[in-house]
C-alpha cells in the first residue's frame, strides 16, 4: 500500500514593509518545529491597518527574494493582482481552490492576534487554517487577555 504524505504549508502574510530578521526567524522556527514542507511569504501591496507605506512594493518583493534566495523552503508570492484582493481570507481561498493547498498553517505575531477580530471573515480563516501565533515583544500579555 502506498502512503500519501500530506504536505504542510505555512503562510506568512503581510506588507513586509520592511522585510526584517523577525520574518526569517519565525519562518525558520516554523519550518523546524511544525515540520512544514514550505513557507510562502505572501506580500501585499499595503497593510489595511497601517496608514503609511515606507518602501515601494517592487523593492519589498526584491528584498524578500534576496534574503530568502538560499532558503529553498521559503518562497515569495505576490497575489494581489491575481486574487484582486490583499485580504487573507481571499488569498487562502484562492490557494485552496486554485492551487490545491491543504494543511495550511497561518503564521502571525502576537501583535496581529490583537487585531484579528477586525479582519474580514477572520472566523472562516481560522477554520480553513491552523493558526500559529509567535510571541512578539511587548504584545504577549495583551494577546493573552
Regions found by a protein language model. Give the residues of each.
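Nucleotidyltransferase catalytic core that binds NTPs
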Residues: 1-145
